[in-house]
Amino acid sequence: LHLATHGFYYTSEEAKEHEYFRMSDKLYYDSGIRSGIILTSGNHAWKGKSIPYGAEDGILTANEISGIDLSNTDLVTLSACQTALGDIASDGVYGMQRSFKVAGVNSIIMSLWQVNDEATYLMMEKFYDELTKGKGKREAFRDAQLFIKSWADQRVKELKDTFSDKIPEIQE
């Protein structure tokens, strides 16, 4: 299962200020609601606008994920920002990664940071290419990481070359 979308995680303090969590004064307490992904039509509810009664809001929370049977799912890849974040407790992190494990997923690829769309696309393309060549998930992912590092290094070099003659020198 591969989802390329927008991920979110808010601390309880941050959630108090967000439109979506203001729908109920108790939503911001639940870490399973403060972590999730936004799917089709989710922007409407995300901005605090009302949705028709009985309609899905397009926001898939960690709580909802944990209630889905994904026991036949070997790998979930979330090409989305900050999907591995969650509330930290003595027994681990409470967020989407725990929810996918509770749902039965064997392996998960998530991000702790904001992700660049182009770099993410290229990295995932390389990852799946390596998987189809018969490599295991770990080796394919490591190869994709090395590929994207090389790609990024080349991009930085190209930018330096492009602008090197335009940067003024400082005279002392």
Please identify what each model-predicted range represents.
Residues 1-172:
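Catalytic cores of enzymes
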